[in-house]
């Protein structure tokens, strides 16, 4: 649980990033848990400023509340005819989640990752309403940050990519594609070049002599993740126009997809 993650890995990682950043950064996978170091590095900066670990937890607790505020703004954009007081009360339902309360008390990357993902949805809704292209950039930027903090949110990139591709086409979207490609390079360099593969097998925080062992094979990962993405996108893809567009995209870019899979 969240307490086990905090005691077994996160608390130690934050302190170690503050004490010896370079060594901890280059050996982060030794901690044996599959959470991104980005948020832990951010929290370690507060230790550098003189705060103690409990004050860091206090900051994280209050940061978590912003999730409710951003969610409320999303509801306002989506349900413009509903009284704002009702929408605010609805947003407070997040407080009922034991997972949210636990992750808010014991600092973890999942809450800030979720905050930026909900912010992604907010910018996406703003784009749907205003059709202002600046919100496509805000959407992608916040999703990149969300994915860096909590990598599991990267699975939503295909949805936004195909949506914006349908709206603008490759030509108008080329700069955004380049931006996303460049944004992915640091994490790819960290995992594959520096060989700090925190996403691979590791120990379960909070439990001694217990581990989850499996080899990290890049080709297998592509197949597994691609299958998961396709499964979750399937309700969207079977809808008339979207399915036709997706089918045409696959046919037009068949050679490119084969080449990418082979690399």
Annotate the PLM regions.
Residues 1-7, 20-40, 53-57:
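Membrane-proximal lumenal/periplasmic loop motifs of glycosylation machinery
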Residues 70-73, 112-129, 137-138, 142-143, ...:
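Specific aromatic-rich, kink-prone transmembrane helix
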Residues 90-92, 135-150, 158-161, 181-185:
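Membrane-interface alpha helices of multi-pass inner-membrane proteins
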Residues 33, 37-41, 49-69, 88, ...:
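Loop-to-helix entry region of an early transmembrane alpha helix in multi-pass inner-membrane enzymes
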Residues 172-250, 255-263:
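Membrane-lumen/periplasm interface segments of specific transmembrane helices
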Residues 71-96, 114-115:
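Transmembrane-helix signature of polytopic, membrane-embedded enzymes
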Residues 78-84, 118-136, 146, 165-168, ...:
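Membrane-interface transmembrane helices that cradle and orient dolichyl/undecaprenyl
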Residues 102-112:
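Short acidic/glycine- and proline-prone juxtamembrane loop motifs at membrane-interface regions
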